Amino acid sequence: MLKVEMLSTGDEVLYGQIVDTNAAWLADFFFHQGLPLSRRNTVGDNLDDLVTILRERSQHADVLIVNGGLGPTSDDLSALAAATAKGEGLVLHEAWLKEMERYFHERGRVMAPSNRKQAELPASAEFINNPVGTACGFAVQLNRCLMFFTPGVPSEFKVMVEHEILPRLRERFSLPQPPVCLRLTTFGRSESDLAQSLDTLQLPPGVTMGYRSSMPIIELKLTGPASEQQAMEKLWLDVKRVAGQSVIFEGTEGLPAQISRELQNRQFSLTLSEQFTGGLLALQLSRAGAPLLACEVIPSQEETLAQTAHWITERRANHFAGLALAVSGFENEHLNFALATPDGTFALRVRFSTTRYSLAIRQEVCAMMALNMLRRWLNGQDIASEHGWIEVVESMTLSV
């Protein structure tokens, strides 16, 4: 099997000053191309360390994606490290120098002398085009390993991987068929509870069940070879049955996007009134393109469930909205949710402890619970479901 590795460079990545989103994206993208990464490393802006790890990984990896260090500043060392590791010098790539000069001229700017460094590549390097930036990429062969050097800017990195590097890999190597990965996301059950229920299922050969907990949700993944797809899809029915009402969506699209599409399909507008969630619902739904109108965030205040229900019913009518959703303030470990619909207003009062999780996580949990209420109503289900450590202490319905 082809051994594909990634090397991230830069002090800011090594010291955790920025999150290495490029590594996460590449690992996921390559996995779905049938190229799962076998190793990831991170090295700072130190020439000796870079040369050492390039030489070391060249003895083990078939392909190494090196990210970062192609800029114009003194701490951008990837080209020099590659040349040093190979025992050769840097040469000026005249065509790329002219392309950079054109790039700056079209934007009404003069190219700084330091940018010339970005056109200096190892003597044996294969040039890789960057259509959206000034940091060209390049490839070199070192021992057994084909190394690709890529810019750290995420938008430039992704374009280069998708349009330049992946075609080269397909041309050079016989790539395996991508694996099958079935995913669903749950809300309201713990990881251990789900695992205890699912561990009794018999997995087909080469198939694994994975769990990813990211409060307040848990993602279940069934991954295996394409040859087992039929058996996996049959097993997936059992997985969904066991997960039961905790399933909130399948795939990777996300709940806000799926709710937004359903609202649009059914021509429902939605108004929001948020206290404890502080605008999280509006943010998540607006990013997904939901048909929102007249959303508000107001200071937290103590309310009975009846007050929240009557208030959101009036708000729906006053704004001529199809639906209206409210999250009250959090007082004495209690909080209200209310959803006003053409069928009536449905409200829940819940209780949960303030000591177990941070404020930010509690806000995320409540936003997810509100979205799940909306999802369940849109699907014709009762708005209340099991939520693990969240206790529903009161419910009410106001007729139309």
UniProtKB/Swiss-Prot annotation:
SUPFAM superfamilies: CinA-like, Molybdenum cofactor biosynthesis proteins
Cross-referenced Pfam families: MoCF_biosynth
Top-level taxon of the source organism: Bacteria
InterPro entries documented for this protein: CinA, CinA-like_C, Competence-induced_CinA, MoaB/Mog-like_dom_sf, MoaB/Mog_dom
Family that this chain belongs to: Belongs to the CinA family.
Protein name: CinA-like protein
